[in-house]
Amino acid sequence: MVEPDRAGCLYRSIEIGDGQPHSFPGELDTIMAGLACGDPNPLAWQVLSDCADAFLVCPDYVAAKGMRVYGMPLAGDPTIISGESGAVTLGALMRIQELPEYDRLREQLRLDRDSQVLLINSERNTDPDEIRRVVWEGGNPVPEPYRRYRNPFDEN
């Protein structure tokens, strides 16, 4: 499960660990408006808390990177025009593959170059101005320490 770091109610609920759904306690200040709910759906919580293998929260720049990569994919992959909430899953997968601090999670999820991962993209181009701000103008850039310019799915 992937949520914005400034709206991660499911993640917060898992962290608290009492089996109950919990609201996100702050402002829902994220470009991922479609995921900025703040309160877990009780039915979804029952299913996800039992079935999801991992819960992640991501800053806005992870979703923005996902949008840019969907819009300019690797050779052979389709171009997808995605909104922020839909693109965060791709951005999160790339982050997990790229950064050493996610080695343990990568092992836990058994992610390697032979993995087949289903990404759920829950948002199309619902806000053309915002998509242009992020994709054309470079809005929400990845901070320098986290930038990677190689294919994260290639082994070195």
Predicted features along the sequence, with ranges:
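Glycine-rich phosphate/pyrophosphate-binding loop at beta-loop-alpha junctions
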Residues: M1-D50, P100, R104-D154
